[in-house]
Design a protein with these regions (language model features):
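ER/secretory pathway lumenal C-terminal domains and tails of membrane proteins involved
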Residues: 1-125, 132-205, 217-469, 473-475
Length: 475
């Protein structure tokens, strides 16, 4: 609590604003990333070591800001001056203090943050920093009163001298932070959002799966505000676990038809099908059941075979049958996935019409989806399987390159990259050794993609913008 939640996740952010910041790189406790500093060399050496030994790119990072603790000192002076101004002063002090506490440390207690946050959380405590800024303003008044009391100066000269002297504090802060807050000429979020959408096939009302904020909100902005690629549908996998979002996905939006989800609402409402266990151990019993039924059929008794196929389908491990007879079964005992290797029959004509690249010289009869290592599939993953089965290669389905393997349903071996997206295909692209549609990739990179002005000298490239570039340079 004290070392991480208070020190690292609150006081570090506090000191960024009133003492100084090492750089704008997200830190996880490293001595060279995201610490607070002062600009006073001997203090910084004690805090984070000799900063002169850092590599050039860290020393010249635009997020390197030093305030020499001047705002901090002014705030402490203002805090003390307010608290020791008699009864009225202490009453005012407690008002500001509780504003400071309730928007700062109280939020730390409430959030109970775990390690390895996906991003810096300084924005959560902005109210606390505003409260401290009140004390900074009072610090100026406090110094004026001190000069009047101890130096016997008149109010006007004291106010003039202190105001001019303290004016250097915001000037210093502005001069340090201007370059890493200047977004002029930079359109990375908008352009990279368009790049994701431009990576999609131009026909067929494509679907793109996203997962985080940075690969979702720019797409929504472009579609909803700029009217760009409104024929495509952005589907956030984080939200796809909820019934209200599935409701939205089942409705048309702009020029995009609804997503291919046939489930009734009662099948995905909150509390229903939140997850379905993967039980490959069932396979042995099912195989034995089919073998016995086929054996009886050879003897002329086809009733058992007809019944078992009526219960579980022609192939009990085929995707549509698993969805129909197992996952969506009314029998709670059958709400499992009885294999860790699902097969999906491939409509070859649909694949030929789809517009996807066809590596090799043939289209497989079946696509194999491995669930090895998975103990269950969650609602969002079930929806992905449902859409894959219902789309039948007639509606292109993509996943953003920024989505991690843990959210790819173990289907990375079926992806072909066409830009900033991977396209779902029926091919085992790992075995074929073809992971990129080079023609579409080249066309996207050289003729369609925009880069938000980051090619211009002096444009501020923060960590998020750099990560967007990495997704292009290191697919």
């Amino acid at each position: 609590f004290f070392s991480y939640q208070l020190n690292w996740m609150y006081w570090r952010y506090f000191m960024w604003n009133f003492a100084g910041r090492q750089n704008d790189l997200q830190g996880s406790g490293e001595i060279e990333h995201g610490n607070w500093i002062t600009g006073i060399k001997f203090i910084d050496n004690m805090l984070v070591g000799n900063q002169d030994l850092l590599p050039k790119e860290l020393k010249e990072n635009k997020g390197h800001n030093v305030f020499y603790c001047l705002p901090l000192l002014l705030g402490i002076i203002g805090l003390l001056w307010q608290a020791y101004r008699g009864q009225k002063g202490i009453q005012q002090f407690w008002v500001v203090f509780f504003l400071f506490f309730m928007t700062g440390i109280a939020i730390v207690l409430y959030l109970n943050q775990t390690p390895s946050q996906p991003r810096e959380r300084d924005y959560a405590y902005a109210g606390s920093f505003y409260a401290f800024a009140i004390w900074i303003g009072m610090g100026v008044a406090g110094i004026i009163r001190l000069l009047q009391h101890y130096a016997k100066m008149k109010e006007l000269p004291a106010a003039a001298i202190v105001s001019v002297a303290c004016l250097f504090v915001p000037i210093q802060m502005a001069s340090q932070t201007w370059d890493d807050h200047d977004r002029s000429g930079r359109y990375v979020a908008r352009d990279f959002g368009q790049n994701y959408l431009m990576s999609l096939q131009e026909t067929g009302n494509p679907i793109i799966y996203t997962n985080g904020d940075n690969d979702t909100f720019p797409l929504w902005y472009n579609q909803e505000t700029e009217g760009f690629r409104t024929d495509a549908r952005t589907c956030n996998l984080s939200y796809l676990q909820t019934d209200w979002y599935i409701d939205q996905m089942k409705r048309p939006a702009y020029d995009s038809p609804s997503l291919p989800i046939t489930w009734d609402r009662m099948e995905y409402v909150e509390g229903t099908n939140e997850y379905v266990p993967v039980r490959p151990e069932y396979k042995k019993s099912i195989d034995a059941l089919y073998a016995e039924a086929e054996k009886q059929a050879l003897s002329g008794n086809t009733e058992a075979l007809v019944n078992v196929k009526k219960e579980f389908g022609e192939n009990p491990y085929e995707l549509k049958n698993i969805l129909k007879y197992w996952i969506r079964s009314k029998n709670e005992d059958l709400k499992v996935i009885p294999t860790d290797s699902i097969v999906m029959k491939v409509d070859k004509e649909a694949v030929r019409r789809s517009g996807m690249m066809i590596p090799g010289d043939s289209i497989p009869d079946y696509m194999h989806i491995s669930l090895k290592g998975k103990r269950a599939l969650y609602k969002s993953e079930l929806m992905m399987l449902e859409m894959l089965a219902e789309a039948n290669w007639e509606r292109p389905i993509y996943i953003a390159v920024s989505v991690g393997p843990e959210n790819q349903l173990n289907m990375g071996n079926h992806f072909i990259q066409e830009g900033l997206t991977y396209r779902f295909t029926p091919f085992d692209t790992d075995k074929l050794g073809v992971k990129i549609d080079s023609e579409k990739m080249y066309d996207n990179l050289m003729h369609k993609f925009k880069f938000g002005g980051i090619d211009k000298p002096g444009i501020y490239i923060d960590e998020n913008a750099m990560l967007s570039l990495i997704h292009i340079s290191e697919p």
